[in-house]
Amino acid sequence: MADIVLINPKFEISFWGLEHALPFMGKRASLPVAALPLLAALTPPPHRVTLVDENVEAIDFERCARADIVGVTGMVVQRRRMREILAELKNRGVFTAVGGPWVSVKEDYFGALADTVFVGEAEETWPRFLRDWQQGAPLRRYEQAEKTDMSRVPAPRLDLLSMRRYAFGSVQFSRGCPFQCEFCDIIVMLGRRPRLKSAAQILRELENLRRERMTTVFIVDDNLIGNKKAIKEILREVIAWQEREGYPLLFVTEASIDLADDAELMSLMVEANIVAVFVGIESPNEASLRETKKLQNLREGGSAVEKVHRIQAAGMEVWAGMILGFDNDDTGVFEAHRRFLAEARISTAMVGMLSAIPKTPLYERLAAAGRLDLEEDPAHGTNAIPLQMSREALSRGYVGLMETLYAPAAYFDRLDDLYLAGAIDVDRAWRQYGRRHPWRARLRRLRLWLETAGLMTRLTLSVPDAALRREYRRRMRALLRERRDPFIARIYAIKSAMHYHALTLARRLAAPDRPLINTY
C-alpha cells in the first residue's frame, strides 16, 4: 500500500483566480482543480490518498515527508510555485510525480526535481504507474498511447476536498476541440476529436455537486459544443434532471462562437440553466483570425457582434477571451478591441497578449522565425515578439486597454447595456419552473435577496476606494429602479465583485514597480 499526497499549488494572482473578489464572497478559491479528485478516484485500494489544494490550505511538508509518493499538478501560471514545492520535497527525500498542462508541454522544466513525469492525460498511466511503483520499477516518463475513453472515467472524489471553501463547483462533460487555432495547446494535449462522458456519468457528478451544496458550477470543457449532436442529447438529460431535482444548479461554460448559428442548441443550453458562456473571440481583426486559423469565427451568419447579440438574446451572457499581438495587429488594435467589447455589450473580457505555448504550431512557427523570447520571465510579459509594433508598444497598449476596460464607468456601461437597456433574460429556465412551484419560488426569491444584500454590504463597506464604493451603490440602485428581480440583482452583485478584482489587477499591472505579468 502506498501513502499518496496529491498537491495543487497556489496560483499566482490571475484574471480567473478572482483573488480580490473572493473575500467578499467568503471563499478561499474560485474553483477546485479537476485533476486531484479525479486521480484520487483512479487510485485503487488499498492505497491511501490525501488531497491538498494550496489555494485553500497550507501544505504540511512534515506530512508530505512521511508519504511514499507526492504528486504535483499545475498549469503555466503555477509553474514557479510547482518548482518551489518540488525542491522542498526533494530536500526531504520524497518520491515526486509531476503532471498537468505545464509539464505536458514542457517536459524537462523540472529536471531532477521530478522522479516521474506524466505527459497528457493520465487515466491509464496513473494506475499503471502505481503498479510499477509497487513492483519497485516506476518509469521516468508516462504517456498514454491513446486518448482516454471518457465513458470509463470515474466520478471525481469531491468528498476529499473542502468544497465549502470554493466559490463555484466544476464538472467536465467532454475533452477535445474540432478546431485548429494555431496558439491553442488543447488540441495538442487532448486532440481534435471531442470525446464525451455518458449522460449517466454526468448526472452522477451533478448529484455529487448538489450533495456538496454547490449551486453555481462551471462546465470546464474547452468547447462544450465540439460535438453538437452528442451534446444536445446530454443537455436533454441534464434538463430532465434539473426538472426532477428542482433546478439546484446554475451553469457557466465555454463554447465556440458558432453556437450562435444553432438556435436549438442555444435553447437547450438555456433550459439546462446555463446562464453565461465564455467565447474565444480573440480579435475583431479578421486578418488576425485568418492568420491564427480561428476560421470558425469567420463563417457566414453575421458579424462577431451580431453573433454575440444572438447568444445574449437567447438568454446567456457572453464572456470573451481576447488576444493582442497577432502578426496582423498594429497599434490600432487596442482601440478596436475597446470598441468591439462596448458594441457587443461584453463586460467580462479576459484580455491577454499573444503567448506561444511549447508544442503548439504557433510556438514552432515563431521559433523558426527567431521571434521567441526564451527567458523564464520575458521583460515585456510574453515570449511572442510582435511583427507590426514594438514589444514596448504591445505591453503598454495591453496595460492601457485593461485600465480602460475596467475603469468603473466603462465596465458598468457595458454591463448596463446588457442588463438594463438590453434586458437580457438569463433566468428563464428557473422562472418557468417557479411558476409550477410557487412556494419554492418564494423561498428562492428570499434567499437571493439575502445573498445579494450580504455581498453588496460587504463590497460597499470593505472596498478601500470610497469613490468605488459609491459607484457600486449607485449602479445597484439604478438597476433596482429598472429591474427589481432578485436573480438579476445577485448577478449584478457578483459582477461588481468581479469588477473589483479586474480593476485591482489592472491597476497592479500599471504600477511602475511591478513586473508585467500577462493575463491568464
What would you call each of these model-derived segments?
Residues A2-R213:
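Acidic, low-complexity intrinsically disordered segments
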Residues A2-L6, R48-L51, W133, A379-Y520:
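Radical SAM enzyme core and accessory elements
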Residues F11-G17, K106-D108, F179, K228-K229, ...:
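Flexible glycine/acidic-rich beta-alpha junction loops that bind and position SAM and/or redox cofactors
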Residues L38-L42, R310, G400:
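Amphipathic alpha-helical segments that form well-ordered structural scaffolds
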Residues L139-Y142, L250, W319, S347-G352, ...:
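Acidic/polar loop patches that form or flank catalytic/metal-binding clefts of enzymes
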Residues L6, V72, V119, I219-D221, ...:
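Conserved beta-strand positions
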Residues P154-W319, L324-F326, D330-R339, A367:
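Radical SAM [4Fe-4S] cluster-binding motif and immediate context
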Residues Y109-R128, L268-A276, R338-V351:
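Structural recognition of alpha->loop->beta junctions
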